[in-house]
């Protein structure tokens, strides 16, 4: 039973004119050892940033896209790739300003035969900031999530920095899982910057870094995911924070990461009205085109379940829906400009 998963998380967030670093985490959740040429693909807008480095040498490098092979990925094994960019300054020909949104897309193959293809692709939208707290927590899905995703996983990145003047021998990251908001039994640790022991006591989770010996100014992080309670309703919000203990010092409290479940028609999502979807109705294939580079094309049923995802890196794409039954579907297209969601009928 092959079953792969991939996530993109910020190590150093995007700031205009500065270097940003992202972590691609991929994991084998199945029971087979897996290998795949060009198995990991990562897309970004190269008009808005310049690639600086990758921690693993790419197999392929094209404008706005990077590919890697992976080999002998063992069951339950997790690996990571770090990617660094220089983000454009506000004075650049293609400027990047505070509150702009940068989109990063990662996929892992094979999607064919995978037990759960919904986590073979991850789209991370990051709001550009002017500064950041080195000890913080962030929900990667954002501040606003569709009500259709109630009961699904939310991903959290907890970052910490030794701001003291001496080496930190032991660090503990402690976070409470509110049983009204989350299902603690679903919590999974996806990745950490250093070797860690995890401990759960009641609704409190501790990530214990023993003998980490983190130098002054050194950074670390924890990436986890947990399902929101399926009893939540539209308009409800979930909150998460953490306390970080450096040796015997008073804990450093992070911010509170708040996520609200409300319709995606809110102003946080810019629309790309140039996108066209045709023919409609259709019997098999759907053409998608627009004025801006397309990133992903996703097909949903009327219950809001994701049925199909296709990567794109051009201003046009074709998605084949012939395997699905006749009826009404929704197609969500994400481009460099924004998002467009439309209804399509298969005859």
Question: Predicted regions span which residues?
Answer:
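Residue-level detector of functionally pivotal "anchor" positions at catalytic/ligand-binding pockets or at interdomain
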Residues: 1-16, 134-136, 147-148, 260-278, ...
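Short, acidic/polar linear motifs in exposed loop/turn regions
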Residues: 29-32, 89, 162-166, 230-232, ...
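A surface/secretory-pathway sequence property marking extracellular, secreted
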Residues: 35-75, 169-213, 262
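Low-complexity, intrinsically disordered segments enriched in Ser/Thr together with acidic residues
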Residues: 69-98, 208-234
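Enriched for extracellular/lumenal, surface-exposed ectodomains of secreted and cell-surface proteins
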Residues: 85-89, 101-117, 241-248
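Short beta-strand edge segments in extracellular beta-sheet folds
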Residues: 127, 258-262, 343-347
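C-terminal outer-membrane/trafficking sorting elements
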Residues: 270-278, 282-347
